[in-house]
Amino acid sequence: MVATSATSSFFPVPSSSLDPNGKGNKIGSTNLAGLNSAPNSGRMKVKPNAQAPPKINGKKVGLPGSVDIVRTDTETSSHPAPRTFINQLPDWSMLLAAITTIFLAAEKQWMMLDWKPRRSDMLVDPFGIGRIVQDGLVFRQNFSIRSYEIGADRSASIETVMNHLQETALNHVKTAGLLGDGFGSTPEMFKKNLIWVVTRMQVVVDKYPTWGDVVEVDTWVSQSGKNGMRRDWLVRDCNTGETLTRASSVWVMMNKLTRRLSKIPEEVRGEIEPYFVNSDPVLAEDSRKLTKIDDKTADYVRSGLTPRWSDLDVNQHVNNVKYIGWILESAPVGIMERQKLKSMTLEYRRECGRDSVLQSLTAVTGCDIGNLATAGDVECQHLLRLQDGAEVVRGRTEWSSKTPTTTWGTAP
């Protein structure tokens, strides 16, 4: 139908009326037997009895009774030219443009009708900020694992996982309508120059997602002591529902002007308490003491670590996720290549500013550092400190053997 209507404007449809001579032929018929060439508008037409004008002294003069030779144009013709196949041919450039338009429109319609999501994760809005579920107490957000969020083994890095946790925490506050002008601060916190700082983080990774996977992150908050708040996360595979990561953290308030810890004011407590969930932590607390290490007990030391401008958050200190990358700077390459990080416990003891210079120390326990290639489970103690020796973060990581995967560019 589309093609017929479009081309009809270029190829006139013959009329069904009959020849007035009664011969039964339709006007506009394509019978080529009686075709005549279309009259030329520039042809000369001679009147009867016309004579060539004589010349006198080289000039033409008219004679009595003579007739002039006149040219007739289509504009002055009293009878229109007969309709023939030749003079009804269209402008081919216009016809080509019409055909192109028809095919483009048909292709677009076909694509719209034929498009079907091949996987459920194709329906994920990558720019959505999630939604509140479970009676308004749990915030849920989906993330698609991007190509720039994976490591050499094709799986998401621990920094990617931690960034997803942080993003859902902030979006939870925003969606609940509690976001002031600060970085996760409520309106009352903003008035009192208060910000949240994390003091403890515990993460257990059962399985790392890979490129293209979609993860579903749930987060909620609970009270922690008199002046703290606990935030938990549960990360699952969006398609299978398999649990991938569990994490729990403790947060306290700090005055951003004095940089000192603060109690939770009653006005702020009134804002956040309606969102507290009365539940146990998603992870049982690892009560083992984090061992302090130094130059003598550390197996690996990395010095001269400095923040980049992009490492700072809006509170003008280094983002807590960045500390994880610095801690792993001193981890042995043998562990990074053959082991996967399965759990991590961090204690944040001091903030780090733009001009800080740090050292990263790692001590390997549970195996001989000379046999990391054949080691099974490995445990490491970590310390991140300033040049003057002040502790920034203490940590413990546990590692297990990676599942063999196919390397890029090799045959399976």
Curated annotation (Swiss-Prot):
Q: What else is known?
A: Plants silencing FATB, show reduced level of palmitate in flowers and seeds.
Gene3D superfamilies from the UniProt entry: Hotdog Thioesterase (3.10.129.10)
Residues forming the catalytic site: 315, 317, 352
**What family is reported?**
Belongs to the acyl-ACP thioesterase family.
Is Lyase among this UniProt entry's keywords?
no
Which processes are annotated in GO (biological process)? Answer: fatty acid biosynthetic process
Q: What's the effect of swapping residue 259 to M?
A: Loss of activity
Reaction(s) catalysed by this chain's protein? hexadecanoyl-[ACP] + H2O = hexadecanoate + holo-[ACP] + H(+)
Species in which this protein is naturally found: Arabidopsis thaliana (Mouse-ear cress)
One Gene Ontology term, aspect cellular component: plastid
Q: Does the keyword Kinase apply?
A: no
List where Polar residues composition bias occurs. 1-19, 27-40
MF term (GO), any? acyl carrier activity
- Summary of pH dependence: Optimum pH is 9.7.
Class of this enzyme:
hydrolase
Annotated region Disordered: where? 1-64
Effect of deleting the gene: Retarded growth, deformed seeds with low rate of germination and reduced levels of palmitate and stearate.
Q: This protein is called what?
A: Palmitoyl-acyl carrier protein thioesterase, chloroplastic
User: Which keywords does this chain's UniProt record carry?
Assistant: Chloroplast, Fatty acid biosynthesis, Fatty acid metabolism, Hydrolase, Lipid biosynthesis, Lipid metabolism, Plastid, Transit peptide
Quote the function comment for this protein: Plays an essential role in chain termination during de novo fatty acid synthesis. Possesses high thioesterase activity for palmitoyl-ACP versus other acyl-ACPs. Substrate preference is 16:0 > 18:1 > 18:0 > 16:1. Plays an essential role in the supply of saturated fatty acids necessary for plant growth and seed development. Contributes to 16:0 production particularly in flowers. May be involved in the synthesis of long chain fatty acid.
What EC number is given for this enzyme? 3.1.2.-
